[in-house]
Amino acid sequence: MVRGKIEIKKIENVTSRQVTFSKRRSGLFKKAHELSVLCDAQVAAMIFSQKGRLYEFASSDIRNTIKRYAEYKREYFVAETHPIEQYVQGLKKEMVTMVKKIEVLEVHNRKMMGQSLDSCSVKELSEIATQIEKSLHMVRLRKAKLYEDELQKLKAKERELKDERVRLSLKKTIYTHLCQVGERPMGMPSGSKEKEDVETDLFIGFLKNRP
């Protein structure tokens, strides 16, 4: 007879749960004993019941097995964390270096702004003056470039206005000339009205050729 597959989930019935716990615990310890004998392995197993009772099995002294396990885990943990510690130490050194660079830049910036100059030597003051002159030169170049760009824009606008003035002047000249010679400029209404003869005689009778 084929045994049905048991669904793995919590057994709700307390009595059935205790019976199953006892059977499975005995089976587990039996398998652990067989593994230690057949493979000459150091095996230990500990189980706490739902009520907190301890059940244990060990192929040798369980304390020695636990001690061996603790030493292994400590060595494993150290081996695993060593690269991490090195990485963290590297980050700390990098952070210290960056902080020092920031401090140097802040001091330099204050000196460039004319602050904290009392502690500067003649050489440092000369270097600061040279850097200020370079900065002023760059500012002047940038200012001149902006002025030149603005001047070019104004000149371009001036050319556009001149062209527009010439175009309007030419248009006005042509219009004046056409008015002087008596021609109607394009788009202007005519000053004379054409006469049209319309025949409006009343005729009664058959249609004939009219004279």
Curated annotation (Swiss-Prot):
It is found in: Nucleus. GO terms for molecular function: DNA-binding transcription factor activity; protein dimerization activity; RNA polymerase II transcription regulatory region sequence-specific DNA binding. One of its GO terms (biological process) is cell differentiation. GO terms for cellular component: nucleus. Disruption phenotype: No visible phenotype under normal growth conditions. Keywords: Developmental protein, Differentiation, DNA-binding, Flowering, Nucleus, Transcription, Transcription regulation. SMART domains: MADS. Residues 1-61 form the MADS-box domain. It comes from the Eukaryota. InterPro entries: MADS-box/MEF2_TF, MEF2-like_N, TF_Kbox, TF_MADSbox, TF_MADSbox_sf. Pfam families: K-box, SRF-TF. CDD domains: MADS_MEF2_like. Gene3D superfamilies: Transcription factor, MADS-box. Residues 88-187 form the K-box domain. MADS-box transcription factor that acts with AGL42 and AGL71 in the control of flowering time. Promotes flowering at the shoot apical and axillary meristems. Seems to act through a gibberellin-dependent pathway. Interacts genetically with SOC1 and its expression is directly regulated by SOC1. This is MADS-box protein AGL72. The gene is AGL72.
